[in-house]
Amino acid sequence: MFYDLKDKKPKNSGENWVAPNAAIIGDVTLQKNSSIWFNAVLRGDIENIYIGEGSNIQDGSVLHTDPGC
């Protein structure tokens, strides 16, 4: 699922695969041919998370950033 967080919205190329129970939150960019697997959480509430072309985030992964990273 994709979730906005205040003024931060996920950006999706539309040419990728996201598991139905994955959470893409806030300032997250997904490039084409990327995949986000089951129970993964990508939380872009502080800084951007950029998932490049052809990348995959495996089952149960949690991605979050600190300020300035």
Regions found by a protein language model. Give the residues of each.
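A detector for short, charged/polar N-terminal pre-domain segments
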Residues: Y3-K9
